[in-house]
Amino acid sequence: YRLKEGRIIRGLRGKARITINLIEYNIYPQTIATFLPGSIIELLEFTPDCDFQMIAADKDFLPLLRGDQLFESHTRQNLVTQVTDTEWKLSDAYFTLIWDTVQEVPFRREVVQHLLAALLHNIKYIRTEEANDTSRRFSHQEEIFWRFIALVNEFSKNERTVGFYADKL
């Protein structure tokens, strides 16, 4: 399934095995996953007790950022992140506050936009800290692989030759 909107998912219970843009991931409890607009998602399997919370937002919903930057900071290997207890509690507070605000009448668009932007910035901060952990650095081969996957996801509708991707790498 190709997503039209970006999504933020919190794994609450159980386990799910998914592919995001050809890469397989496992989502467990206390996991946060972000999916870019245009991502290709496939649910491979899930346990009977699997439960998620999800926020979906059109790329044009956050005018304070350029539409193509909505989930920009969550590309490549940082799509799925296991978080600490403190980070998990904070993400729960964001989800609850966003949900409660969405239910208000009249709809408070700007408030929801800024809360969502704050949540995305917090996820970016968590992942930046994770990326700075030198024990998690990628090999040169892994970096090339991730660049290749990103190129396929960006150009696969129009480009289908190996030569095109080889030139880009």
Q: Where is each model-derived feature located?
A:
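Short acidic/polar alpha-helix capping motifs at helix-coil junctions
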Residues: 3-8, 41, 65, 114-116, ...
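Amphipathic alpha-helical segments enriched in hydrophobic/aromatic residues interleaved with Lys/Arg
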Residues: 73-118, 122-127, 150
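Short, Lys/Arg-enriched, Trp-marked, Pro/Gly-tolerant hinge/linker segments that flank
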Residues: 82-85, 105-110, 125-169
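Short, flexible active-site loop motifs that bind/organize anionic cofactors or intermediates
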Residues: 20, 52, 78, 102, ...
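N-terminal regulatory/effector-sensing and dimerization cores
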Residues: 1-74, 104-105, 109
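Repeat-unit-sized solenoid/scaffold elements
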Residues: 44-52, 56, 119-136
